């Protein structure tokens, strides 16, 4: 079977901890989401979908394996536990002839675990990754170091990853992790293997708390 002619390209936009009702399309008065609204108008909106587990890592494991928490072995926020899943959403796409690409956050462990991604432009939150390896740098850190002349922090002082206090991003907007994730996703599409369809995961760290 020629995958180029029988399978459409697939892009999965995967934000972190985005409330299901935070779309202006759904009538939320406090947020403006014109680009996501456009996708809603052109596609299908599922308003009665629920996560099998309410915590980040465990929900991600269910999402990419198609299994429930009992089967994945993750019922809560169990960080630092290796992801040993031989069959994932990405391996299924890869085995079907797709080029599998990630741009942004995955929150796997180890952070560089690909789990079926052939191309991985990785963002890993600085405070998370360096808990396990003080010298760890993801692709975004390398980019930020180059652009800022050595500064690699991707957050601001005194701002917790799960707190309520916020501060202004200290760098230019194009250096923000969300902007980098989008840029790498676009670059991945432009440089993809033209002989194969592609599956692209676009993993945004935001609007994860405190935002």
Where do the PLM segments sit?
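Formylglycine-dependent sulfatase
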Residues: 1-211
């Amino acid at each position: 079977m020629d995958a180029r002619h029988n399978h459409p390209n697939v892009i999965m936009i995967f934000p972190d901890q985005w409330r299901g009702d935070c779309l202006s399309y759904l009538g939320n008065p406090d947020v403006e989401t014109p680009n996501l609204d456009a996708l809603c108008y052109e596609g299908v909106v599922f308003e009665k979908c629920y996560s099998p587990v309410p915590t980040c890592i465990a929900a991600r494991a269910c999402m990419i394996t198609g299994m429930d928490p009992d089967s994945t072995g993750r019922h809560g926020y169990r960080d630092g536990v290796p992801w040993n899943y031989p069959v994932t959403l990405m391996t299924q796409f890869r085995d079907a002839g797709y080029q599998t690409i990630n741009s942004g956050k995955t929150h796997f462990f180890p952070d560089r675990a690909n789990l079926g991604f052939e191309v991985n432009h990785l963002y890993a939150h600085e405070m998370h990754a360096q808990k396990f390896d003080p010298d760890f740098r993801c692709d975004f850190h390398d980019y930020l170091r180059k652009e800022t002349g050595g500064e690699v922090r991707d957050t601001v002082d005194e701002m917790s990853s799960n707190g309520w206090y916020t501060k202004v991003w200290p760098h230019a907007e194009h250096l923000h992790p969300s902007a980098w994730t989008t840029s790498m996703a676009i670059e991945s599409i432009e440089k993809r293997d033209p002989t194969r369809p592609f599956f692209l995961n676009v993993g945004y760290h935001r609007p994860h708390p405190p935002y």
